[in-house]
Amino acid sequence: MDYGKTLNLPETEFPMRAGLPQREPDFLKFWEENDIYGKKQALHAGHKKFVLHDGPPYANGKIHMGHALNKILKDIIMKYKYARGFDTPYVPGWDTHGMPIEHAAIKELGLNRNELDPLTLRRKCHDFALQWVDIQRNDFKRLGVLGDWENPYITLHHSFEAEQIRVFGTMANKGYIYKGKKTVYWCPHCETALAEAEIEYGEQKTPTIFVKMPLVKDNGQTPEAAKGKKAYMVIWTTTPWTMPANVAVALNPALEYAWVECEGEVLFMAKDLLAQVGAVCHKDLSNILGTTLGKDMEFAECVHPFPEYNNRRSLVVMADYVTTEAGTGCVHTAPGHGDVDFETGLKYKLPILCPVDSQGKLTEEAGERFKGMFVFDANIPVLKYLAELNCLLGKENIKHQYAHCWRCKNPIIFRATSQWFASIDGFRDEALKSIDDVQWIPSWGQQRIHNMVSDRHDWCISRQRVWGVPIPVFYCDNCGEHLINEATIDSVANWFEKEGSDAWWAHTAEELLPEGTVCPKCGGKHFHKESDIMDVWFDSGSSHMAVAAKRPELSWPVAMYLEGSDQHRGWFQSSLLTSVAVAGRAPYESVLTHGYVVDGDGRKMSKSVGNVIVPQDVIKQYGADIIRLWTASSDYKADIRISPNILKQLAEVYRKIRNTIRYILGNTNDFNYETDNTNDFNYETDAVPFNEMLELDQWALMHLQLLKKEVTAAYESYDFHVLYHAIHNFCTVEMSSFYLDIIKDRLYAYKADSKERRSAQTAMHEILMDLIVMLSPVLSFTMEEVWQFMKKPANAPESVQMLPWPEVKEEYINEELETKWDNFIEIRSEITKVLELARRNKQIGHSLDAKVELHAEGEALAILKSVEKDLATLLIVSQAVIVEGAAEGAEATGREDLKVTVAAAEGHKCERCWIYSDEVGQDAEHPTLCKRCAEAVKD
């Protein structure tokens, strides 16, 4: 008789090899064809909502690992919240306006911007953006992200643009919108403003100069020893041509500055830079007369060295960006020619001088000496003039990375031009208070955005481009007065509802304005339109109003925003500002931020370095579930590492989790809910109640409850790496290495319908059910595969994603039982080490070939005695004997109260279960079997 065929061996069609790249598309098709997202929403209609508002990715390229991380984090949260009973509508979005798309469209399509009328260019951009929306949508869906993919929000949609106009109008009517000056990147060769996306950096040789600025107001800080001598602040600049626009000198408030005697004069500069400046300028700067903290010089004054500027004052201001990395610690400040200079200028209400025209030539405002010179050609003349005036302390040429126009490859400049702004001062206090009402995850995000909003200056919201939502302002042809009010905003918004923002270029001002509109200043009836468009951050910053507040399935304010940590400066802030300005509160109740994706060494990914990993390649090799597992395994609060080795390790973790589940499926193969076969395990009638289970099975279910507690807490606090480690440990250590290994004999060798086997099967089924729900938000494809393989009641949900969250069964938790088994597991690991040593020494083959004598005393003795009846089974040996006290020749363990002797098992080996026993041979009908196995095969 072939006794192997009488064993209850595991049997399942659930494949050992996942084959995720090939199988996952089948589940995408299943979810889509069966409208699982729609059915989920219908099932939870009327439940409390949890709205996670999607930060719109930019529609101009393939998704990268940062996109994948972000979308999967959102998906994990939404799937968990659904299982907890929430109504979880998820509307994905896209950002589709702005310069990157405009330039990408021009470049890809080979267009000449100057030869296209605005509407033609806009239509090209429109089509280009939607093409990338489709590509990205498919990539996001491939990651297993569930949402309303057929009805996303897109910033170029008519309804979105109309609502954006209304947000702008509300802010304007409250007095928060005004026109002023702002420095922008400017290409003198292309004669156009540029965005950061339109610049690239290249090496350039630049003359740097150390300039003596006569100090005329010292705040009483000049040391006694320096009084009576001519004093100068020494500034440093890499752009000598901007000297005509100098209106301030910036110091770091915390730096120590020195008053130094040099050649009969007193020079003021950072103490830590004296040696460096002295070496470059060939000056002895060792005679320090005194020191002053930067903050004590705030509002002191210098005078511009050029006499033709009529003693124009240069204010001493404070700026944290001033460092001792280079220069003098006294920074030349020209708000008309620098972004940080401009911000400093706004803070101190400095004049914004910009004596440069659109072609990069210095104007009359720079003085007759420099008028008409191209900016970079003026560097040497400025340097020579300063030398003539005895105001040049020194100079040197340096090579550094400098911004160039991506189009013409020439160096660019900063240039102040007229722009539209949102005034933050009008609602700054409200915004800061609103920040305190939001939950920030991690908590440091609160202080970060608080500092940014507290320190930020007015928001420049205009761009000199065509592809975007226009600034809805009209100008009177007669007097130049600008016109924007509730009536004009309503009219423009209504046009946009019908035709989109193309209407601004397709219709005249008179057509767009309400009939009978006249200039409130002069009564004029003819108008022209503003040519600037809005900053794309105003687009996405209006999305909470245009989407969450408008779509009936959503709600406002939303429960959560979730994006990368760079969005404290970006979308989190633009959304906060528009929301507070319009509605008086933050648009979100919580904000979660994650770090950047970097390589395995913590370096930024770069094509030139060759360390770029893209989601598409990972999916082809491993499948999307491995990316999802990587997302959950990462502590996203810091930068998140990824590398081929990390992915390989995660694939191994995935394999272990999958094998644990497969083992349970295989050993519950006779399980069913509705069956007439008496040999099958009918869960309704054959499940063993908890209090009747074998104690080891009770232990397993108790640990399942503890796992549920830990995993639920981790989901609630968004600490997904905690639940990853908890489930991984549960599957590999508590289940595979301990519980499932021990019950193998019970499952295989006991009669199929024995209580011992049914007890284990009941426990395993409950473990499997809870595991697939806990893992479904992370391993969405694999858990769907498991669910489809499982035998279920007729009324079971068609998708694993519809299952409710498993409740913790507190009655299963017994501290005494937990302590008992935790203590035994610790002792068992010591015994297992000795058995492994015996195996390596060829003393035994399999552990069932062994008899162990356990020489124990004290605590170890008590623990072993508590499980003495099942000790051999628990150790997976044929015999286990407890001997009180120590023994000569026994193998020492990591415990002083336990030694182990391993010997060959006594008796004969049962052909069916492989356990050695004196009972083998006692049954004449089955002489090679032990008593238990003989009884099992007779039935």
Explain the meaning of each model-derived region:
Residues 308, 348-360, 465-467, 486-639:
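Alpha-helical recognition segments enriched in aromatics with Gly/Pro capping
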Residues 187, 405, 476, 519-522, ...:
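Short cysteine-rich clusters marking metal-coordination/redox-active sites
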Residues 248, 255-330, 339, 343:
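Protease-associated
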Residues 95, 184, 188, 194-202, ...:
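Acidic, turn-prone loop/beta-hairpin segments
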Residues 191, 464, 480, 523, ...:
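Cys/His-coordinated zinc-binding microdomains
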Residues 184, 402, 473, 516, ...:
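Residues immediately within or flanking Cys/His clusters that coordinate Zn2+
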Residues 2-13, 17-20, 26, 30-34, ...:
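Residue patterns forming the tRNA-binding/recognition surfaces of aminoacyl-tRNA synthetases
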Residues 42-104, 155, 164, 235-243, ...:
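N-terminal catalytic cores of NTP/NDP-binding nucleotidyl/phosphoryl-transfer enzymes
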